[in-house]
């Protein structure tokens, strides 16, 4: 394998994380991130050792994951500060800055039954062709929703491993919603006078305890609800006799969605390709006891979708747009599994497992930042030929990974970026010897 030397653009980003490590540990950290960003082969500690130009024993890279002293919490905090500094924050209609975090889970297939945390989990993402259950790890991820070159993207921040109740001690068992709360508690949030923290999640994290905790901590929650949810009117009419009533008249969301007059707004979501009709109502959720805004989304030939928001100041259009941007975390899972070695770890210690996954997420986030810088050079210098299927926008994560691999192998900067077609031809073409090497080879045969 070739030795990978990071270019200046990537190394300047890696220097941001130097306070989290000692000098020897930072050198191993650079080797891991450069290897993961390049995406060469199966991304394990052995691959990092083979591609690193440093003279170090191969066991040092395994011990960097299992027993070296460095904090994942500090690494996530530095990454969050870097993303906020370089990408900025989204502003709502009232001019407030919103720090949008995304929660979701994914499955990583593993065949070893002796590996820590491996169990059979219900498959809700891979399709029926792969079976209803998969053997592997169940990861809960927290990501930051940013906009790069006008397009929303999700950058991974932190991970937690879910273990089934029957496979761990009772004191160590945590549900996915409890793991999500631990991720939010461990994150070092930035501060600001007009900063609003917002969490986006799917229906799997619509837990009443998690929502109440977020409201107590001043965190807004936007999640998917049920069409048959028990909702009550805010106005409580008292009869004058007996104990005072706590709940108003019930509101049926199914009947509310069946009335055509309630859908007063139409917007376009998912890159302005899908027209969606919106209807909104404010009520008190019976299960959580919170006052929520319920937004009903209706598209052609689809069942209505119900969204719940604890922030009543957000308009229905903003709630629908933010939840549509939440889908970027699914694309991030695909990039992590296909190009950044999310499931390539071959370790048994839980700490080494968790650190490997965190480094893969960090490499994915830094590659997305480099794709933004690549787009800036593309528009200014015109050195990159645009792909025929994308008229405008930043390069994809995989294209940036190919260019980064070329720069690391050539020890060059991002001044001369090759086209993706040149990279494909270069990977398929056989290596030719120069005239001097050919003459030396013939003389050696004689």
Task: Describe each PLM feature range.
Residues 59-63, 125-195, 291-306:
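Electropositive, glycine- and tryptophan-enriched low-complexity nucleic-acid-binding patches
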Residues 1-28, 36-37, 148-161, 173, ...:
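A short, flexible helix-boundary coil/loop motif
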Residues 31-38, 303-327:
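Extended, non-catalytic structural segments that build the interaction scaffolds
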Residues 69-163, 275-281:
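Active-site-proximal, Lys/Arg-enriched surface segment
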Residues 107, 254, 316-347:
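Short amphipathic alpha-helical "interface-anchor" segments enriched in bulky aromatics
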Residues 166-241:
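Domain-level cores of phosphate- or acyl-group-handling catalytic modules
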Residues 1-73, 79:
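Gly/serine-rich nucleotide phosphate-binding loop at the start of the catalytic core
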Residues 48, 97-111, 142, 197-206, ...:
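Short, conserved catalytic/metal-binding motifs centered on acidic residues
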């Amino acid at each position: 394998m070739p030795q990978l030397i990071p270019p200046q653009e990537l190394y300047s980003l890696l220097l941001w994380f130097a306070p989290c490590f000692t000098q020897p540990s930072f050198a191993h950290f650079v080797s891991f991130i450069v290897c993961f960003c390049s995406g060469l082969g199966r991304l394990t500690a052995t691959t990092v050792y083979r591609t690193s130009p440093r003279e170090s024993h191969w066991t040092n890279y395994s011990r960097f994951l299992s027993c070296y002293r460095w904090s994942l919490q500090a690494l996530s905090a530095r990454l969050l500060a870097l993303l906020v500094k370089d990408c900025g924050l989204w502003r709502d209609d009232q001019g407030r800055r919103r720090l949008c975090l995304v929660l979701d889970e994914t499955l990583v297939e593993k065949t070893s039954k002796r590996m820590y945390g491996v169990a059979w989990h219900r498959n809700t993402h891979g399709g029926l062709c792969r079976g209803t259950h998969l053997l592997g790890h169940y990861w809960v991820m927290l990501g930051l929703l940013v906009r790069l070159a006008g397009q929303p993207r999700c950058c991974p921040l932190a991970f937690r491993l879910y273990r089934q109740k029957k496979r761990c001690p009772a004191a160590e068992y945590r549900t996915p919603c409890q793991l999500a709360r631990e991720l939010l508690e461990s994150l070092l949030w930035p501060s600001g006078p007009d900063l609003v923290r917002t969490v986006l999640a799917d229906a799997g994290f619509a837990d009443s305890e998690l929502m109440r905790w977020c409201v107590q901590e001043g965190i807004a929650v936007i999640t998917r609800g049920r069409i048959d949810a028990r909702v009550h009117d805010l106005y409580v009419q008292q009869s004058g006799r007996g104990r005072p009533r706590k709940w108003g008249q019930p509101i049926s969301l199914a009947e509310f969605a069946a009335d055509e007059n309630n859908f007063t707004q139409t917007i376009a979501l998912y890159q302005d390709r899908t027209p969606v009709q919106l209807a909104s109502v404010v009520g008190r959720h019976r299960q959580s006891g919170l006052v929520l805004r319920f937004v009903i989304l209706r598209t052609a030939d689809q069942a209505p979708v119900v969204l719940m928001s604890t922030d009543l100041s957000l308009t229905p259009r903003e709630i629908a747009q933010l939840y549509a941007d939440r889908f970027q975390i699914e694309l991030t899972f695909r990039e992590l599994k296909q190009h950044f070695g999310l499931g390539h770890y071959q370790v048994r210690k839980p700490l080494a497992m968790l650190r490997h996954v965190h480094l893969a997420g960090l490499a994915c986030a830094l590659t997305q930042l480099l794709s933004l810088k690549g787009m800036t050079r593309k528009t200014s210098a015109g050195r990159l030929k645009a792909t025929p299927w994308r008229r405008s926008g930043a390069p994809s994560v995989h294209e940036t990974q190919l260019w980064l691999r070329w720069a690391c192998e050539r020890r060059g900067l991002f001044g001369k970026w090759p086209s993706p077609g040149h990279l494909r031809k270069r990977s398929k073409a056989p290596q030719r010897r120069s005239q001097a090497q050919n003459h030396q080879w013939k003389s050696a045969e004689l």
